[in-house]
């Protein structure tokens, strides 16, 4: 009988669906395991082979955990609001809902064809009113807590998309060729900064890749510093700056304020006012990326004003420059050009003084010196000296002196900014707020607030969304008076901030999640997805989860216990897959050619899951041959009958190979080292074939090991060996520890660390016997002759090393 993968895969997918094989158990008696993919945006281009990698990994773990006795929750859904569907609607007039439904259908068919063991009864869609009712509910709780507010802010405005971008989205859009400018708009903003300290501290409790945790730490950007007041001459006011280096105050030679600083224009003297106004106008057209790039040419304008350095009494010129951001610190800095590279470049360009106040190995007029390891110099006055003190002591001494004088105070700052939450588009969750004629805001009392149908999807030239044109939806009245609904919608990130909770209880119409179900299932045990979401989705979801924790909706302080980032699969040309490069490998194509089991195995065998690796068609053909070998363990002849499996005793060597394989595959699967687990199974299959093994335990154990990886062929062979139930309900094989090691081991013998011989011995041979045998290995004896053995080092079952003199 031939291995006809297409018929076999369709057969078992139908059986799984009909029997509800992967439906999540309702009982809470078993230990739980919640394994989750970052759910996809259903784009029109469909899934390619790179998308399948993470989904395959999570499915292997889901199947493995079921076979180990866990109650597994493994769901799938759709992050379906977003710009692409709206842009397609603008071009074609097709409602985004229709486009989204078609795309979801295509995605679902591909995922089902891969044999992924999702519980499809848990499927969710962020555009479903029954779902976004609760997204809106969370927004209203944020509003009631003072964490959602309206503010006039300079936003990142994309001219082509006619919408606002979050700070975290700007780099990607510029890289894609879009134009992004700064523009003042009244926006909804979420106060994520209120949770900055908790978001930072709780990272230490997570089993996440260190690089992702560090990216979040850097984005939050906690810094300890001092706010220092510089008295402005001729103004009778103070200019407050923030610095993390109060120990360098004696070296401050000028101050710089942001173009948006409330004093910026007021600081300008009559002679400088025109130039200052022009500079401020130009700065407002730039994005933060353009303003803060390390390689950008420094620009600035002198205001004509001076401020007094509280440590030296010297007057310092006050400049305006766009490299200072109003959103960080106080929007004003003291510049110490000798010990800060940006300040040094600015001082050189505008011929400003450079004073050494940290002992430097070179002339600071020739090059900046930024080291904290050196000590202060030239840093004393009649009241204080910090010369010669180490950094921490100098910092504290200076901070205490400033506080005592009333000229400064210690403070903690964050680079993290509040989250601009509004979007000027149609295809998003409506924000459930009503604006009344007297200026008051009230919340919608009935949720969900759904989207009306519109004839045109284009944002207006003024920046308002298409909702502003739907009069019947926009205006209304109630007992509080006439109102106008909010026309901004939520960003795409809103629905993905909490979807992992809804998977637990997707049909609940009365509450976001049942408390008992939440306590059982949370938090997510394994979350698999790309590292590109480190400071977007992952940070936003953690923020919302902490808010829900404070509201007693959830019982855990973090949503995702363990995070794993899969590496990217490149095209065969070693480049990232993209339509523009023409190197995209559609998932449907390889599924039709090689089958789901081959694709699953190949993607996991390519290399370590976390590494970037290229697709190679020759490699998947090799995997197909391996599956053919597995098939022939049960169907040895192409057209013949099944093999007769027996209970004959296996040779000890083969028995040990079987148990070593079970142990290795178990440990590697648990650790997501799928490539080495597959390699170990290949070795076992070769050994079974070489020995002509027909032992039932050996063959069935091999099929059980393969089941999480290649479930369709495993189901078919399990049935062929006489079993009536699904292999998906069978326990994973166990190994006997004593058999999971070699009976005879090879011992390396070294003299002073150099290999001089080897010998074979039974595993577990005592150390004294190993030493005695090693002394008498013929090739070793000549290196010991006439030498004093100073030390004998033994690694059991591996090595004996003689240290001689």
UniProtKB/Swiss-Prot annotation:
Residue positions of motif 'HIGH' region: 40-51
Record key words, sorted: Aminoacyl-tRNA synthetase, ATP-binding, Cytoplasm, Ligase, Nucleotide-binding, Protein biosynthesis
Enzymatic reactions: tRNA(Leu) + L-leucine + ATP = L-leucyl-tRNA(Leu) + AMP + diphosphate
InterPro entries associated with the record: aa-tRNA-synth_Ia, Leu-tRNA-ligase, Leu_tRNA-synth_edit, M/V/L/I-tRNA-synth_anticd-bd, Methionyl/Leucyl_tRNA_Synth, Rossmann-like_a/b/a_fold, tRNAsynth_Ia_anticodon-bd, Val/Leu/Ile-tRNA-synth_edit
Motif stretch ('KMSKS' region): 576-580
Residues bound to ATP: 579
Record's GO cellular component terms: cytosol
GO BP annotation list: leucyl-tRNA aminoacylation
Top class in the EC scheme: ligase
Documented EC number(s): 6.1.1.4
UniProt subcellular location: Cytoplasm
GO MF: aminoacyl-tRNA deacylase activity; ATP binding; leucine-tRNA ligase activity
Similarity comment: family membership: Belongs to the class-I aminoacyl-tRNA synthetase family.
Protein name (database record): Leucine--tRNA ligase
Gene that this sequence comes from: leuS
